[in-house]
Amino acid sequence: YNWGAGAKYKLSKRNVIQFDYSGNNYASRYKYLIENSGYLPGQYALTKLQKFHDAELKGIFGFTTNSTTVFGADYRCEVLRRPDSDLDKSVYTASAYGQHEVKLWNHLTGVAGVRYDHHEQTGGRFTPKVAAMYNIGNFNVRATYAAGFRAPGIDELYYHMFKKTMGTRATISLGDENLDPERSNYYSINMEYRTSRFSASVTGYLNYVKNMVTSKSTKFDDLPEAEQNRLREEFPEIGDLSSTKNLSVKNYFNFEKATVKGFEVNLNGNLFPGFTLAGNYTYAYGRGLNEGGEWQNIERSIRHTATITGNYTHSWSDYTLNLNLNGRLQSKVYYPGDADGNAPGYGIWNLNTRHTFDGFRNFVIEPGIGIDNIFNKKDNRPLNKNFALYSPGRSVVISLALRLK
């Protein structure tokens, strides 16, 4: 579950002070069907608990007619508890930032800002940002530079866990408290054309990352004998396995440097009244310099991704039909160095309909019916492989919403 609250105080028409708080609590538990590990049938054992708190105070000021200035402070706290990893940790990040946006001339807008983040475990860093937008008629051109900072996650720092996964697979995950935070320099340029019925945009980007946090998986049987013996002492669960053939060891580490470059194309058109067609294509080429001095694909990176959506809406008196057809297509997901190999690409299409009945005085009824995975695409490979498609196959989806007027 999650929750939040916020408040605004208007000093004047263009000057506002705002406070926002959000919280998130996620817990997963395992239900025992037979007596095991001291638990009776029907009892639950906590497997994972995550909490997130974010409090932000900011002021938005219009000091001049053509400018907007923002100052703010942000405090975030993350908590992760995993009994199977003897992990119960929390870390905080405190931040302060400022940004100034000004319209210099009729067609040119500039943005400059700076942010400071301090992470409890890895320290802090200033990150500047500069952007400019030029617009004339239906055309917009944007250029952006932004420095970035990301501290390693609690799992990447502290995991020390044995876990059975799908089928006969098992994984030992080992975090590293000495991981360095990521630092990046991001450059992009965007060109956009927009009318009342059609829009198109192209964005190209380069992202240079130092100390990118990644991981590698090694088969337990491929480790030196001394390393195997050490892990057997630390994780007695290994002795319960019938074989270590499908046991992997996952270690987190820093790339010395990494580069992600690519482009994105978006098209959106209203072809005739009530019908909209939209498409997106993304190309991303991500490589990192590993510990052996070799460049490799970034783990879980996807080279090609495309989405297509067609939406039709029409009303007859008190009834409105909404028909949506959407598809997602992607190439393989890279798992470099993983003995279980890459996850193959896939294409999934879904059809959804929503029917709105507005002939009632106090409420509106909206039943819906659709088909997910129309062409019944499934990945039926053995469970000890890496997967990108988890769909069980074609399924019918039914919903009902009641809205009060």
Features from the language model and the residues they span:
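Face-selective signature of the C-terminal outer-membrane beta-barrel domain
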Residues: Y1-T122, P128, N135, S201-G204, ...
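Outer-membrane beta-barrel channels and translocator barrels
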Residues: S12-R14, G62-N66, W105-T109, N135-F139, ...
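Conserved C-terminal beta-signal and adjacent last beta-strands/turns
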Residues: A146, T276-Y283, N297-K405
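Transmembrane beta-barrel strands of outer-membrane/channel proteins
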Residues: F19-G23, F71-C77, A112-Y116, A132, ...
